[in-house]
């Protein structure tokens, strides 16, 4: 009593404390970063290695395997995958959440160094690593176009100057430049001219390499001067290489230009980038795993004026894609929803109390509690994101509950004629324990969430802490500021002028009288109500099993990604044509704003596209509806497929896949994997629960298999090394020398001129100079025949792997898809040598499914323990928790009604309902117990009186929580797919709970009271008819 009196009788101190909380919250709000979701990115590092001309199998065995063995020893690696394609290997290391990315990077570099001696000597450079997840969608894409600059020159400028500058911006993890390659001097050899001159390809290579040398020459000095020696030992342009003497034939000089075309070109001519319909260089910017996307994008945008100032006038720099506008729009929608919730909650209070002064009290308490929460969020390192703002939106209904309970009880004493300060003190004392019980038991619901591990735990932690802090501040405010304002602002009234007898008050009285009449009937038919209660428990179980489930709601971020997969034997020229055709189809769609894409490099038969949709206000369809519409048009393109998926704010795993979800096949036998993967993929493609089924296993690439006759080679004086060197020189785009320039280093690339390598007959023109100096045609000692070969070789851990990716058709949940896949795998009878498991988001979904029930049970158990401690009873917490089954039924039925799957967001709603609906029972039980102790009433009389006495605050708190959540249900625009499942769950649960618990709670209270008496071997009192 003295504690409450301290604040009631010292209004200045109380007001200043509340002002201090508010000011701290305002400061915290201004300092909080902005993000779409809490920071849940796994630390991911990508290791890259190249060996131009090497086949995928060679890259896998000689490059990937040694690196994997070394990298696999690093502590904290959650998953290691690799993909080896033509001339390149990429290894993705995904670390545990608690692994520091910088420490992991140091370990990765050490592992690369340890494996260096095991790697092929012909690698042009050491393996490198990047602290970025290649499967993440870029946060921004910049494009460079020019009417006068070549693609190679644009690429050089982009990679040498722009990418370096952008990479230095805080938060940027990787700047991937695509669409071309660095400038190079290309030497296109004429096989017939070489044969006529008797010059081998190795001789050409050695001559070029020897003619372009950068070595220190030293200096000459005397007693006065010093001269640095400088020579013309470097060749830098095609014009300087053409007159190079590479051989003498009967005393006549054979120059490079006589046997080859020498041009200023690019390192890899098999690259192409496009933006809309124009050739372009793309700068795809990805953030560091721990970086804030909005801050990073803002940093890039702030740098753009400086970048444009350093760009020549002939180059046009544009932003082709930016993830931040939809994120900002989504957060603005949540903020507006929060404001509407506050207004609706205050309106509910006003309609019940019909007093401006009384309404002003919760109208002050709510903002103080919410704004003060921002200070705690800042101290905890949180951000303003969809989940934390949704937590505050839901908290609106919670924080006003405490104020309502205190205010309503004080108002009841004022209506009875008690003086304001006395009413404030008496009313607060009566409900102080109730308010504390409600708040502590509500916070207890979130304790299991705080202890939950993995990605779901990280994702929900900010939500749980934010809501708990808001409830804690609300508890303090409701026991200090609220009674002080009541005592000094409200006036006592005579019974004949009670406001609740007019308008809404008259309706409330009528409802209360009707409730009293129906409650009398219920208390005289407790068995029927008991059956209804048990029915809700059974219905909960059935609904939870039957409802479709998913991990996270599918978001419409306004950005699509597309993966092109063409015939495995397609040429680069044809692949570039497919890219252009697909881009035209998408560009013509009315909902599309911008399209960029690229192909080439190690992506022999694949490409990537990035599509920016128009803002939600300018299009009628959702991202998924647009994908469904485009899928029909894209399917008509022969020889290739384009798989579209909506970019999500949560992307789990480091695999780059052409669909949102993955199922990975593993085997220690590559032959078994290659045998069963097509069968499994075919079976999964036939499932109606899956769409866009595709695989990263591509074993049907065209290959020309050369078979050496070793006996003939020995007789002719030719070894295998010379033969292999011939093929590498001719067809491997071999980098044979380096040109050093002030800003970068460029390569001299040698190969047979494309004019002479259009078909297989090019092999017939190849020859080797034997030990006797004679030109021996390749056909003399080798035979060749076409065959199939893999375009990529994939590993997970150290096992051969193949990942089948899939999307979900409209109306299908992830749980339905995973069940269909598991059922199909069982029906196929896949041998034990081939193992299947879900990867990425589908894997996390499976783990979350296994822990959902445990989490709900843990929350209920935690609430029971807290309530048991507060009430010093084993029985009363069970009475309070009896309100939960009806809320669960309402929530699950509402989800079914709105055709919304049960997701992580819906799980949050269920957890919130555990905290919300028990408040009704707490108010009933508290007053019933007090009536039994002090009033000498029987349990039947006590619970009946408690139900009638607390009917008004129960209705007020329930309607406040309901109207606080209603804007989430009705919200549209950006991010609504996250908000609506939470609102649907809470509103559905509250409506059903309010209809049932007003009757089931008193019945359960009486049941446990009689059970208590029976176990204590006391005769129960006779039932009193009411």
UniProtKB/Swiss-Prot annotation:
InterPro entries the UniProt entry points to: AcrB_DN_DC_subdom, Acrflvin-R, Multidrug-R_MdtC
Spell out the subcellular localization from the entry. Answer: Cell inner membrane
Which molecular function GO terms apply here?
xenobiotic transmembrane transporter activity
One matching Pfam family: ACR_tran
**Would you tell me the protein name for this molecule?**
Multidrug resistance protein MdtC
SUBUNIT field: Part of a tripartite efflux system composed of MdtA, MdtB and MdtC. MdtC forms a heteromultimer with MdtB.
What's one GO-annotated cellular component? plasma membrane
The UniProt family comment states: Belongs to the resistance-nodulation-cell division (RND) (TC 2.A.6) family. MdtC subfamily.
Claim: Ion transport is one of the keywords in the record: no
NCBIfam families linked: PRK10614.1, RND_permease_2
Q: What is its main location?
A: membrane
Q: Which residues cross the membrane?
A: 15-35, 333-353, 360-380, 387-407, 431-451, 463-483, 528-548, 853-873, 897-917, 953-973, 984-1004
Q: Is Amino-acid biosynthesis a UniProt keyword of this protein?
A: no
Q: Which UniProt keywords apply?
A: Cell inner membrane, Cell membrane, Membrane, Transmembrane, Transmembrane helix, Transport
Q: How is the protein disposed in the membrane?
A: Multi-pass membrane protein
